[in-house]
A protein has these predicted regions:
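Short, surface-exposed "cap/lid" segments of acyl-processing enzymes
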Residues: 93-173
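Hydrolase active-site cap/lid region
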Residues: 215-230, 238-308
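N-terminal cap/lid segment of alpha/beta-hydrolase-fold proteins
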Residues: 21-102
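Serine-hydrolase catalytic core
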Residues: 277-410
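Phosphate/oxyanion-binding active-site loops and adjacent basic polyanion-contact surfaces
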Residues: 84-88, 193-204, 390, 394
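Active-site loop->helix "elbow" adjoining a glycine-rich segment at hydrolase catalytic centers
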Residues: 196, 231-234
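Alpha/beta-hydrolase active-site loop
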Residues: 154-218
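Low-complexity, serine/threonine/proline-enriched polar segments
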Residues: 16-39, 44-53, 142, 160-177, ...
Length: 410
């Protein structure tokens, strides 16, 4: 079958509410597996915070509103992040070959920023199972996919949000219904970027805890765990491999697709990702004024300190020209387990920035980076179009891309 036909078939078959989906054509099953996050109390919205590891307490210091007369913006902002149930109780899909045995080899797939549906990733997961023989687990980032309130994807509500953004910020660019929710939330509280990232980080550790304890219904307790990541999912995956919490990822491989650069080497302003106001807010907070902001935000400063090495690795991945020795020495140690596939016409994650970030300032980090240019119209968000016009070329290059990725994860 063609990529297009596979995509349409999987889109029709996939139901995130169905516990078990049989794909007879591929001799695979999709298992939508329930998960309860125990890490939501790190998010904005709590009155008091406590770091159990270091027995340190903090008070909430964020104001969750826009401070302007914009009812729909405020509806998005005044909600307590830590109380959003969809982000605590959710399911994640597992692609698994026909077998009753628990999987001993698993690839965790991490998606891009502002994703609301698994549709794009279904053919990717299917091909990785086919080419590697491994199980593929698609894990959603906090407030993405099925971890967000339905209203954030409601066209009528988002249209009102979008109009308010343009009213108060007439110079905004790349504003759209697709990115109105995430742009609003990150513009007014850029710290959400790190807190939701940390929740996802700890959720994945919780998942690994479950696997290692032997209580996961579909994955063997001694399973090899690798990562395939796309876009900003690569930012998180890379940090996880760098930090190697609990020694869980000492043997894990990571292959990144359209991902890999440091934060200040990416350009996420897009109608599908972030609008210009949110992009500027993120850059201003994490790149230009981070040290000043950390003096104001004691809890964030605690998690960015040497006491939490996840925070230190996150900090090291923000700016290409800072923490160079710390970051690149660690990358050199894990280089043989990391690889990347970059696209030359990618304007969000430019291929040259993937190479510069992963090869280091001295160009001596031996991370494998392959840069290609598809012979059909594509971009970062849609690398494999489903139109009939270029169907044969898309089939060819999708297969080549997935075979390269699978080869790095075998």
């Amino acid at each position: 079958m063609s990529y297009r036909n596979d995509y349409l078939y999987l889109r029709e078959k996939f139901d995130p509410k169905a516990e078990f989906i049989t794909l007879k054509k591929f001799r695979m099953n999709i298992l939508n597996t329930p998960f309860e996050s125990y890490n939501y109390d790190i998010l904005p919205g709590e009155e008091h915070y406590h770091c159990q590891t270091h027995d340190v307490s903090f008070e909430e210091s964020y104001t969750l509103d826009s401070k302007i007369s914009a009812p729909h913006l405020d509806e998005l902002l005044k909600i307590d992040d830590s109380r959003i149930e969809e982000n605590i109780f959710f399911t994640y899909p597992i692609f698994k070959s026909f077998t009753l045995k628990k999987s001993k080899e698993v690839i965790i797939l991490l998606h891009g920023l502002n994703e609301k549906s698994w549709e794009k990733y279904l053919p990717w997961a299917h091909k990785l199972v086919e080419y590697t023989g491994k199980t593929v687990l698609l894990f959603p980032t906090a407030f993405h996919m099925n971890r967000a309130p339905a209203s954030w994807a409601d066209p009528r509500f988002m249209n009102k949000v979008c109009k308010e953004r343009k009213q108060f910020y007439p110079k905004v660019t790349n504003s759209s219904l697709a990115n109105a929710a995430i742009s609003t939330r990150l513009q007014f509280l850029p710290q959400r970027f790190i807190w939701s990232g940390l929740q996802t980080y700890y959720d994945i550790l919780q998942l690994i805890d479950q696997i290692r304890a032997g209580t996961h219904p579909h994955i063997h307790k001694d399973a090899q765990i690798d990562f395939f990541s796309y876009s900003v999912g690569s930012f998180l995956a890379e940090i996880m491999i760098l930090a190697n919490e609990n020694d869980y990822f000492k043997n894990s491989k990571l292959c990144m697709f359209c991902g890999g650069p440091l934060l200040n080497r990416m350009s996420p302003a897009s109608k599908y990702i972030l609008d210009s106001e949110a992009n500027v807010a993120i850059y201003s907070f994490f790149i230009e004024h981070l040290e000043v902001e950390l003096k104001r935000d004691k809890r964030l400063a605690h998690y960015f300190s040497d006491l939490h090495h996840i925070g230190k690795y996150f900090k090291s991945m923000l700016d290409y020209n800072k923490m160079i020795t710390f970051r690149e020495n660690r990358l050199k140690k894990i280089a043989k387990r990391i690889s990347a596939l970059a696209l030359q016409k990618d304007e969000v994650v430019p291929s040259i920035e993937v190479e510069l970030s992963l090869h280091g300032h001295d160009n001596k980090i031996p991370i494998k980076v392959k840069s290609i240019d598809f012979p059909y119209p594509y971009d970062h968000v849609i690398p494999f179009p489903i139109s009939e016009k270029d169907e044969k070329e898309v089939d060819k290059w999708f297969a080549k891309s997935m075979k390269f990725i699978a080869g790095q994860l075998k």
